[in-house]
Amino acid sequence: MQPGEYLIDQPTEAIAANLGRATCELLVAHTGDRPIQVGSHYHFFEVNRALVFDRGLAYGMHLNIPAGTAVRFEPGDSKIINLVAFAGTRQIYGHNGLVNGALDAVDQRQTSLNAVQQQQFGHRAQGDLE
């Protein structure tokens, strides 16, 4: 045994996470010239403006991947990603400043979508990307 080593029994069944939460699949296109990496719990609606996707569908969601992992987008990439709704208090602060408050507050979604347009974040309806 090494110092700090963990000895973990193998689970007898698969670990299930995010059960009962809303999910969606999005096609994301990277139009920039540098790789972009997005962490597991970043509010996907607010990711780099060079990623083009339906931000309205991504509002209030993060990547449906294990905590502490990330998805990398290379320049010119297009890929389908799976998102899951945030739980808890559903308050988002920081990131790119498009929400900075409660996701479910009156008019917050529309205010945030207006900010996407004003600040020229990549946004296209899902059907327009396919």
UniProtKB/Swiss-Prot annotation:
Q: What CDD domains does the record point to?
A: Urease_beta
Task: From the UniProt annotation, give the residues forming the signal peptide.
Answer: none
Q: Which Gene3D superfamilies match?
A: Urease, beta subunit (2.10.150.10)
- Location(s), subcellular: Cytoplasm
Catalytic activity annotation: urea + 2 H2O + H(+) = hydrogencarbonate + 2 NH4(+)
Coiled-coil residues are: none
**Pfam families per the UniProt record, alphabetical:** Urease_beta (PF00699)
GO-annotated molecular function = urease activity
Tell me the pathway. Answer: Nitrogen metabolism; urea degradation; CO(2) and NH(3) from urea (urease route): step 1/1
The entry assigns this protein to a family as follows: Belongs to the urease beta subunit family.
Q: What is this protein called?
A: Urease subunit beta
Species source reads Herpetosiphon aurantiacus (strain ATCC 23779 / DSM 785 / 114-95)
Q: Which gene encodes it?
A: ureB
